[in-house]
């Protein structure tokens, strides 16, 4: 199979790891950085009616800015329940995204939002802003998964890219709880700059939704 791009040398890998470390340090030192994670009813590419069922934002001090369950206004599919553990009974009577969305938009305005697999979280969020006629605020984004995958340096020749790494479960709590995933992402950034060396308490987290 023809390679899509040249296999990086060890020197190139070292330089890229330094750049990823510098990115993590910059994000941790920037008080405008917020860590985002959402749990949903599904994946937009497979289900255009996907809704958020939980959302969390954490600042770089580890303080939750918001963490709440959201009523999706539709039954939560069993496959989603099996991943994040959120069922229909848990969201009865809670606000939906039409109510929660403006709060999220206000919180991320002029911020730098970091997410693990940001293409999923940010794309879903912006899609729902549009669906509910919520003005999309100005904000910057970056993907912790892309940075961490480059930092790990596992090259996939058939892809011509780094192997995507699952989110290490560095924070205690249930996998696929949005607040736990935010904290794991924050601790991962600290690990990348050498400020956190504890072993993950359990398994890695596969962030499908």
For the regions a protein language model found, what residue spans apply to each?
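Residue-level marker for buried hydrophobic side chains located in beta-strands
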Residues: 34-36
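Short glycine- and acidic-rich boundary segments immediately preceding or forming the N-terminal edge
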Residues: 1-27
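Short, flexible, glycine/charge-rich loop motifs used to bind or transfer phosphoryl groups or to couple energy/partner
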Residues: 22-25, 102-104, 130-132
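Metal-dependent phosphoesterase signature
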Residues: 82-103
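Metal-dependent phosphoesterase core characteristic of DEDDh/y 3'-5' exonuclease domains
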Residues: 2, 9, 31-32, 45-54, ...
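Short acidic, Gly/Ser-rich segments with clustered Asp/Glu that frequently serve as metal-coordination loops
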Residues: 38-46
């Amino acid at each position: 199979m023809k390679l899509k791009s040249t296999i990086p040398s060890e020197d190139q890998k070292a330089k890229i790891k330094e750049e990823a470390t510098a990115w993590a340090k910059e994000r941790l030192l920037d008080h405008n950085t917020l860590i985002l994670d959402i749990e949903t009813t599904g994946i937009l590419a497979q289900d255009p009616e996907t809704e958020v069922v939980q959302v969390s934002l954490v600042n770089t001090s580890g303080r939750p800015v918001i963490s709440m369950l959201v009523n999706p206004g539709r039954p939560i599919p069993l496959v989603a329940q099996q991943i994040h553990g959120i069922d229909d009974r848990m969201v009865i009577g809670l606000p939906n995204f039409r109510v929660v969305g403006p709060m999220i938009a206000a919180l991320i305005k002029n911020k730098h939002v970091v997410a693990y697999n940001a293409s999923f979280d940010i794309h879903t969020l912006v899609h729902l802003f549009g669906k509910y006629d919520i003005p999309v605020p100005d904000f910057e984004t970056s993907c912790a998964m892309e940075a961490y995958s480059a930092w790990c340096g596992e090259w996939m020749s058939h892809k011509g890219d780094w192997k995507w790494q699952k989110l290490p479960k560095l924070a205690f709590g249930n996998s696929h709880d949005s607040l736990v995933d935010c904290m794991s992402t924050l601790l991962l950034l600290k690990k990348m700059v050498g400020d956190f060396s504890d072993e993950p308490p359990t398994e890695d987290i596969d962030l499908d939704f």
